[in-house]
Each structure stands twice: as structure tokens, then as C-alpha cells.
Amino acid sequence: MAAHLSYGRVNLNVLREAVRRELREFLDKCAGSKAIVWDEYLTGPFGLIAQYSLLKEHEVEKMFTLKGSRLPAADVKNIIFLVRPRLELMDMIAENVLSEDRRGPTRDFHILFVPRRSLLCEQRLKDLGVLGSFIYREEYSLDLIPFDGDLLSMESESAFKECYLEGDQTSLYHAAKGLMTLQALYGTIPQIFGKGECARQVANMMVRMKREFTGSQNSVFPVFDNLLLLDRNVDLLTPLASQLTYEGLIDEIYGIQNSYVKLPPEKFAPKKQGGGGGKDLPTEAKKLQLNSAEELYAEIRDKNFNAVGSVLSKKAKIISAAFEERHNAKTVGEIKQFVSQLPHMQAARGSLANHTSIAELIKDVTTSEDFFDKLTVEQEFMSGIDTDKVNNYIEDCIAQKHPLIKVLRLVCLQSMCNSGLKQKVLDYYKREILQTYGYEHILTLNNLEKAGLLKAQTGGRNNYPTIRKTLRLWMDDVNEQNPTDISYVYSGYAPLSVRLAQLLSRPGWRSIEEVLRILPGPHFEERQPLPTGVQKKRQPGENRVTLVFFLGGVTFAEIAALRFLSQLEDGGTEYVIATTKLINGSSWLEALMEKPF
């Protein structure tokens, strides 16, 4: 059991156990000792559902990363390839199998595709002459991975690019399959709302899948009241802005991968007595797991960074007072009680030390002049100031050859806040970028245009002010310490995606029909009839539970905003978040960048 998955209204341990059971059953089918050959990308997501101890219990003795040529020597009966259905991986597998066949004693080969088998991949293995070598060729439907008690992700890094650039619906199919799995475990979701073309496709796929499985009536009592499917391209603006929550900033600066972050080690080195000892500083990055299993992290992760310092200093006083209690312990009983609390207190002290170090690292960035200048420009754009002309700060960034990703984020943000740039402004930016960073980046600029992130304003009309005012996307007075509105996550800007979720809950989307028509893609509502006997009756005062599924990625700041809404006393709705990928502005744009040869 992973305790942090079961704290919310929806116990996500049920899903984790279901996918673990499926994995155990496959491993047991391959009788005898085993080696797993991993597609490297899958090791992170797998770590969230099955640690090495589980694999070991089922006779997994060796683990290797999939590479071309020969496998390392392993005295095992079974070799299992655990891979995504990608053609380039099939070429490596074929090399491995052929070199093993030449090596001597025969092994049993198996392949487990995650999350689906692919006819194309099996054909490639056949063309390479190794398809017949596999005893089991199966799929492991790991569509949605539980990250936290209210958070699920498919961790499909190319989903946005596939959907919006390549017209490939594979990830939408996986999303629909994942939602069908959730409904099998947690009951039919009575109402589906959606906004966007991809949302419409996923809803259609779900209806079709449900028709195909009419034989089995779902008699599980529904846990979710609503499903909201949101296309990322309905709100392209939000991920481009700099996140200002604690967790969002950790991701922006260091990158959080599968709940882990790697940090500069020198901040975490134990303090030496008498100074000196600099040459003994650790050189390996400090790796920390970040989820709500850690009490302090759960408390500060969603706060605006400016509110984190006061929480940490308050915690320091409480912990220090708790340790002082040992001087007051006089009787054997009191000493015993203090000793029993010691492990928890020491863990709390370690946690505080880690987060104090992380906060210092972040503060070094957020107090820099460049961070302030960049944030000022972003906030001017989002509040509607000077969005229609070439920006001096962006010009300076290009002239000083700042990282290209930073420049692209700012230019795309300006484009989104002006419903596209004037043609001459767009041409100027493109020319400056290509001359400074290299003409090979023309492919990246084309991708950004195709995705709608960078565009020329058509018809001379800027719709952003209408959207901003109607949805209250910009708030001048933000209380970062004790927020009253979701705009605290960006210190003034309320994420459009989350505002849509909030307005759907109350008073409903009819109140914003005009804006919904301006935003891309259709908006719709579907009802799913519930089997008799499992109709949901809410208790007085009981909140609705809404699953918000972001198709194309979600940021930690948006997650924080939805958690804020869940905690409102009179909010009426608790949110569970699902997504194709956890993203920040840089990782999102990098997935759209064409790598120069």
C-alpha cells in the first residue's frame, strides 16, 4: 500500500493494486528465473507502481537497459523485453535476440508492450527475422499512473505533438482506454463535459468502447460525479507563464521527473565543524522524492513561493520546541514517550532541512534581476499591456543570446495575449531568432505556428481582452499568503483552464457561452446512464467529485489551483486531476522543437 494514494475521496491505491496484479500475473506466466530488459523511458513511471522488491519476489534476478548489440551475460531462463511500441526499439530488440541466439543455450524470450501491442512493431520484428523467437507477445495496459492521492498521468511525452501537429490519435485512444479502466474500478461517471476537438474525440471513443462492452453492466457504485475533458489548446497561454508555486518553481528550475527531483549537492552537504573541508563536498546530485507522503511537502507544495518562508520558520520553531521537551522528561514513562516520538521528530527535522535548502536555491533564482525582468514582461502581457509591438526585453534576450527556449516562451506568450502578433512583429521576431540561433530552427518555428502557439493576428481583432475580462483572468490585488482566488499561483493571472473548471462547477457554462465560442473547439455535455441500483445519492453537505482530464499536459501551478478549489469550504466540488503528461513551459515547447542534425 502507498499511503499517499489513499488520502483523498478517491482511493487511487485501488488502481495501483490493479496494475500491479496484472504485472505479477504476466511475470508468473514466464516460469523460472528472469531478466527484464527495459525501455529506459519506462523505468521512471514503473518505479511508481512496482519497486524492485516486487519484481524480485517473482524471480526477476537481473535488469538491463535496452541498447543495441549484445545483452550483458545473465544466467536466467527468461528474458522479458518491456517496451513502448516504437519501431526504433524493435531494431534494438532484434539485435539483442540474434546475438543471444548465437551465444549458446537457448532462452525463452517474451515481449510486453506498454500500453498496447502494435501490429506495425510486430511486423518489424517479423521482417528482422525474430518474431518467432518470442513465446509471449502481450500488452500491459499501464495507461494512467497514480502519482499522488489526486493525480494521475499517462506520462506520454509526445501526446501534444501527436495530437496537434501530426494528427495522430494514439494517445487519445490510450486516454479513453485509461478512463474505461477507471470506470471499471470506480463506477460509471454519470456526466461528461468537454471543451476542444480532442476532448470530443475521447468522449466519442468512450461511448464506442462502452457499446462494445454492453455485456458487462458496471455494478460498481460511482465515485466520480463528473468528468471534464479539456484540450490543452483551449488554453495555450497558461503553461507559457512562469509558475510561482513552490512545486511549480522546483519543476521550472530543476525539473521533476516521476515524482523525483535532482538538486545541486553542495546545499545538502552536512555542515563540518570548524569550517574547511571544502574538498569533501559531494559531487553527485541530491535526489529527493516529492509527494504528499511527506507531511511538510504536502503543506507547502501548492503555496505561492512568497508564502513558503514563513511556514518553514514556524515549523523550525515547533520542531526545536519538541526537541527541547526532552529536558522536561523526568519519569520513566515520560522518557519512554519522548523516545517513541523521536523517529517522527527526526524525520520532520530532516524534511525541514531539505526544504529549507531547496527554498534557498529557488530564492537565489527568484531574487535575480533577470527573473524579475522576465516576470515583469510576462505580467504586462497577461494584463494586456503593450502586447501589439516588439518588446524591448525580448529583443535584448535575443541580442544577448539567452537560451532559445526562454525567448520562444516569451514570444509565444505575447502571441497568445494578443490573439496573434501583427505580421510585421511576427516577421521581425522570426528573422532575429533565425539570424541569432541558426536557420535550422525554422522547423521549430513552423511547429509552433502549426500548434497555434505562434501566429499572425487575423482580421485585426484581439479577443484576449474579452476572454480576460469575462473569465477574470487577471487580478490586481492578490493575497499570496492567504489566497482567496486561484490567481495566486501566478501572482495575478488565473489559469484559464482552471477558471473553466471552476465556472462549470458553479454557476455552469451557460453563463460564459460567448467566451466558449471564442475559444477553440466544440464544448459539449454527455450523460452516461447508470445501471439500476447504483444511482448516486449525495449526502447533505457532501461535495461532488470531478475528474479533470487535461489532454496535452498540465502544469503543477494548475494542479495547485484545482487543489485550492477543492479545499474551499463552500466550493462544493473536489477535484482529481488526470493528464497525458506533467509539463512546464520549457519541457512542453522542447517536445515541439526539431533537433538540429
From Swiss-Prot:
It is found in: Cytoplasmic vesicle; Late endosome membrane; Lysosome membrane; Early endosome. One of its GO terms (cellular component) is perinuclear region of cytoplasm. InterPro entries: Sec-1-like_dom1, Sec1-like, Sec1-like_dom2, Sec1-like_sf, VPS33_dom3b. Keywords: Cytoplasmic vesicle, Endosome, Lysosome, Membrane, Protein transport, Transport. It comes from the Eukaryota. The keyword Ligase does not apply. GO terms for molecular function: protein-containing complex binding. One of its GO terms (biological process) is endosome to lysosome transport. Ubiquitous. It is a peripheral membrane protein. Belongs to the STXBP/unc-18/SEC1 family. Core component of at least two putative endosomal tethering complexes, the homotypic fusion and vacuole protein sorting (HOPS) complex and the class C core vacuole/endosome tethering (CORVET) complex. Their common core is composed of the class C Vps proteins VPS11, VPS16, VPS18 and VPS33A, which in HOPS further associates with VPS39 and VPS41 and in CORVET with VPS8 and TGFBRAP1. Interacts with RAB5C, UVRAG, STX17, MON1A and MON1B. Associates with adaptor protein complex 3 (AP-3) and clathrin. Interacts with PLEKHM1. Plays a role in vesicle-mediated protein trafficking to lysosomal compartments including the endocytic membrane transport and autophagic pathways. Believed to act as a core component of the putative HOPS and CORVET endosomal tethering complexes which are proposed to be involved in the Rab5-to-Rab7 endosome conversion probably implicating MON1A/B, and via binding SNAREs and SNARE complexes to mediate tethering and docking events during SNARE-mediated membrane fusion. This is Vacuolar protein sorting-associated protein 33A. The lineage of its organism: Eukaryota, Metazoa, Chordata, Craniata, Vertebrata.
